[in-house]
Amino acid sequence: MAAMTVQLDMVSAESNIFSGRVAQLQVSGTEGELGIMPGHAALLTSIKPGMARIVKQDGSEEVFYLSGGILEVQPSSISVLADVVLRAEEIDEQAAVEAKRRAEAHMANAGADFNYAAAAIELAQAIAQLRVVETIKKNISR
């Protein structure tokens, strides 16, 4: 018996990143972690910066970094619209470490006109990218 699947289309501002049948999508919504499987109730929510994990029809997995965006779930399809989508292997770990360090330094030395919200977003994105890299490293070492 074939595994139940649903059509997933994941796009960034630049291109179509993934289009195919999946058994499951795991993503971080603004209200918490979401696990979307075939037959899930209709849903429209914001996505926060973090990891998206897909389980393909053949059982293999693929991991992505999403900078945030919108998730739409319909009975027969899932759409992920994100500003930036990176495959895990495309993440520059050193650049993410530097961005995290820079954001933390800005927050520690904040002046009266400091844009705390922008620094918090930069920090959250860097931490999310590093979590994706860490997850991939753990899976490789198994």
Curated annotation (Swiss-Prot):
Belongs to the ATPase epsilon chain family. Produces ATP from ADP in the presence of a proton gradient across the membrane. It holds the Pfam family ATP-synt_DE_N. SUPFAM superfamilies: Epsilon subunit of F1F0-ATP synthase C-terminal domain, Epsilon subunit of F1F0-ATP synthase N-terminal domain. GO terms for molecular function: ATP binding; proton-transporting ATP synthase activity, rotational mechanism. It is found in: Cell inner membrane. Its main location: membrane. InterPro entries: ATP_F1_dsu/esu_C_sf, ATP_synth_F1_dsu/esu, ATP_synth_F1_dsu/esu_N, ATP_synth_F1_esu_C, ATPsynth_dsu/esu_N. It is a peripheral membrane protein. One of its GO terms (cellular component) is proton-transporting ATP synthase complex. F-type ATPases have 2 components, CF(1) - the catalytic core - and CF(0) - the membrane proton channel. CF(1) has five subunits: alpha(3), beta(3), gamma(1), delta(1), epsilon(1). CF(0) has three main subunits: a, b and c. Keywords: ATP synthesis, Cell inner membrane, Cell membrane, CF(1), Hydrogen ion transport, Ion transport, Membrane, Transport. It comes from the Bacteria. The gene is atpC. This is ATP synthase epsilon chain.
